[in-house]
């Protein structure tokens, strides 16, 4: 990882996602999260990894932050867990205000285009948006990480 100051990773989530059982079996997908966490820890750089909340409930992910689209003014119910390594931060965001029958979900199949647009992923196809996270999540975490890196530079 020479030349990099930090790493963000989003390994595929199908081996932990409950929705996978609707279409087959989670055992049909490799667990890439566990080796990703080991690899990230070996680099010694600050890192962030994202996955479904089930990866924190039933897998190796530690949910340092759980984010929902409604926390960022998006009409989207899209919970994702994030773990940080070699740095940490505490910053409050609005509480999750998702509503089962009002907010858009990725697997409704009738409003998929609206879901992608509501996430802020207007350039993605409907199918791509099913596996994406709202850019607002990465922006929020990336801003915090940039602040951490800048503070490290100042103290060095």
Model-derived features: positions:
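Class I S-adenosyl-L-methionine
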Residues: 1-7, 13-155
